[in-house]
Amino acid sequence: MVSRMVSTMLSGLLFWLASGWTPAFAYSPRTPDRVSEADIQRLLHGVMEQLGIARPRVEYPAHQAMNLVGPQSIEGGAHEGLQHLGPFGNIPNIVAELTGDNIPKDFSEDQGYPDPPNPCPVGKTDDGCLENTPDTAEFSREFQLHQHLFDPEHDYPGLGKWNKKLLYEKMKGGERRKRRSVNPYLQGQRLDNVVAKKSVPHFSDEDKDPE
């Protein structure tokens, strides 16, 4: 019985479209001479709602948004599996893998890290990645400074590959750079003929006029 009603209504709809008739509730002022796809979708959605096939939408006005109580959740975000979008669920989504322009999709054995990060990723401990290093900002600054000054070809000619362990050993064995807490430009005798901006001029006793 239901299938007969659906076929009857669909045949009537096709007859309307073939005859060029436009229903009053599906009238579009932009295209008065032809029926748009949005009008067809609205008409089909109305038919499906009347037959109980489609679930009607529940929309809340803006002034009722603050009246919602209890936990609310939103479904259908990215990477939540295969979804069907659109008012009728006939638009399948595409689950794309998020990768950068220079980032390969898989890190196989032939695609190693040229400069492995810390802490070590899984399976990359033997590539020069450090495991037992201080997790402080000061060590990170010092390590990056030595990393730019480190020349493996000059310091270690037999080393054909970058190695963080040698740099770490060099940092622990060498003298630490002392921070300069005294401004060297403020030491020594001050010149009297140099006057700072917006300062009170100072005159020595020799420049005073004899009374």
UniProtKB/Swiss-Prot annotation:
InterPro entries in the record: Secretogranin_V
GO annotation, biological process: neuropeptide signaling pathway; regulation of hormone secretion
Modified residues (Phosphoserine): S140, S204
Top-level lineage group: Eukaryota
Subcellular location: Secreted
Signal peptide location: 1-26
Gene Ontology MF annotations: enzyme regulator activity
Pfam families recorded: Secretogranin_V
GO cellular component: extracellular region; secretory granule
Post-translational modification comment from the UniProt entry: Proteolytically cleaved in the Golgi by a furin-like convertase to generate bioactive peptides. Sulfated on tyrosine residues.
Entry keywords, A to Z: Chaperone, Cleavage on pair of basic residues, Disulfide bond, Neuropeptide, Phosphoprotein, Secreted, Signal, Sulfation, Transport
Disulphide connectivity of cysteines: C120-C129
Chain intervals for the UniProt region annotation (Disordered): 106-132, 173-211
Function: Acts as a molecular chaperone for PCSK2/PC2, preventing its premature activation in the regulated secretory pathway. Binds to inactive PCSK2 in the endoplasmic reticulum and facilitates its transport from there to later compartments of the secretory pathway where it is proteolytically matured and activated. Also required for cleavage of PCSK2 but does not appear to be involved in its folding. Plays a role in regulating pituitary hormone secretion. The C-terminal peptide inhibits PCSK2 in vitro.
Quaternary structure annotation from Swiss-Prot or TrEMBL: Interacts with PCSK2/PC2 early in the secretory pathway. Dissociation occurs at later stages.
Annotated family: Belongs to the 7B2 family.
Protein name: Neuroendocrine protein 7B2
Gene designation: SCG5
